[in-house]
Amino acid sequence: MNKFEKTLHFIKDVIHEDSPFYGQIYLVGGCVRDELLGERYSDIDLLVNMPNGQKAFIEYMCAEHADRCKGPFYYQRYGTTAMDVIIDDSLTLVECVEPHIEEYADDDITLLETRFCSLEEDASRRDYTCNALYKNLHTGKVLDPTGRGISDLKNGLLITPSDPVTIYRQDPVRMLRGIRFKHQKGFRLDPACWKAICDNADYMANAAPKRLRDELNKLLKSRTFCDGIQDLITTGLLQYVMPGIVEHFTNPMPFEGGEGGITLWEHTHRALSVQGREHPRTDTIYKLACLVMDIALLNGRDEVGQILLNAGIGREKVGSILHITELYERFRNMFDGEEYVAPPRVLVRFQNSLSKSRDNFRRLVRAENTGLLPEVQLPWRLFYDDGEGPQPRQRRDHDHRPASPASFPSDPEASSRNHKRNVKRREQRKRARSRRRNTESS
């Protein structure tokens, strides 16, 4: 049980049947979606189905269980009240809202009024039907006010519960979330939603930079984030997420050293594809370094630093990304084509300087080789330690099994004896290894 599940169990246990909150607390949004997908919670969003219920509930919890619940914290802009719950020395943020509907001016941007509403009205204003699901904390019953949230979730379809243009204009970050869900969860985006995103990308100028940065970081953790970046380019969203980078990615000039006359973006896309497919857990710093590597090589690190800072990425993180691009450029300068031209000690000192980052740097070099001509590819295998290296996969198809049936014991008793003998030998080898380790440690 992770910290989110423990927190929900705690809240469920302390709200008894005689409490006014009993039966009125719902898990909502991503919590319910992820649970139905068989995934673990990544955050906790609660809804209290009563007027001003979110404030009353959080204030009650912080007063009655002050040893566990710290707060309350009020976020007037989003109509949210939150608290920190401490269980087993782990801190979990719990955000709470009431069902509400927002009244906007004719521009669909200016918020005029927020009022309490029914669950059906609350569901109609959410971003996608698969996120408009409500699970009662005490009964466990899942409500689907739109009537299609569960079926859309099963079919992997992203569609807004009402007019997508209105939904996106009221909160432009929902467009970016749609792209992220498409690649993070493997969903399909409804054609009407895709068209609405393309037609209303300019509204992203009204979004808070921090929210855009958070969505970008989440997108980078998906296996197909390279295609996600391509979608951001196609829809016009990338110019708001990372201002200044689009002009480099849309440059039609062939990339120097690229295979078959590919452009800068085509090479970057191939490199990102390798990182996402083969090394999805690579630190996002290395993924961002891969994203801007070609720009740094052609236009310098100063321009890349400005692009990253304009995207709201912190200075410390930007410094780490630029350091990685500098390391890659230094490594590339050690070679003239396939020939190593630097003094021998330079490579040794360079490898030692990488320390714990050696694996990540090796993966980066390997990814950057993708789409380059063979004569300009860099030897990424140099970063394996002695005795290490990629092991060939053991093929187990029928073509590599003994062709003769005589090689298999036909006698069941003989087969059983062979099995017991092999088990005994494995145990003997295991005990021998254990004795060697004990001897070395003593």
Model-derived features: positions:
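Catalytic cores of the polymerase beta-like nucleotidyltransferase superfamily
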Residues: 1-442
